[in-house]
Amino acid sequence: MSFRIASPILLPLVAMSMGMILNNVVQAGPADNIYSPIIDYREWEFELKGGIQDFGNRNRGELAYKFTFGYGIAPRWFSEIEVEYPRSPGNAARVEEIEWENIFQLTEHGEHWLDVGIFNEISHNRLQHKNFFAIGPMFQQETGRSQINLNILWKRQLSAVQEGDAGNSRNALSYAVQWKWNLRPAFQPGVQAFGSLGDPAHLRSQELKLGPAFFGAARLGNGRNLKYNAALLGGLTRETPNATLRFQLEYEFF
């Protein structure tokens, strides 16, 4: 079997293997999403992301929304500002985190068997008074109607360790992977998986959630598009929420 033919299977297998050997520090939120390394120059984007997980569980239940505004600054650079608005059982919803995210496209779309990019994020958690830096590669592989995306992210706490943080690592790894079948523009079935991984110095399996997803897009004319996706994810480890329902709406225009 050639490497080109095997590649649609290789990426998700690598991601799942990572989820089985790595440890979690901070769980992936219900409104998290998967990023593509492909950039549309001079395109504006407005996004609404949301999700709910185990809301009846006071320890790990959460309802969260993310509001995002972005622009394709250069042919290979897209930048956006994101605000996260979560709520846990028994608590009021509050703006928790403000994020500045950047996507850098490293390869020309379709010229190689694998499209590659770099994702970077600087964030401030205003409730915990902590700052974070995150960076990692993004991969996209297309064969026929099949498309696979893989994100791997290293995140580090920049602010000083606070009281109560003793024993917690300042570094964490996470990944997200999806497969979709481009059946038709309005509906594309697929699968998504998210894992929050842990300190690379102490590798142990902890969180992994996986489930069916669907994707779609509608052309609105005059360079305007509406994209959407949603997934129902089941927890595969004891530390993962039992069920997560997530969605993403994206309005694009030039």
Identify the meaning behind each predicted range.
Residues 1-34, 254:
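Cleavable N-terminal export/targeting peptides
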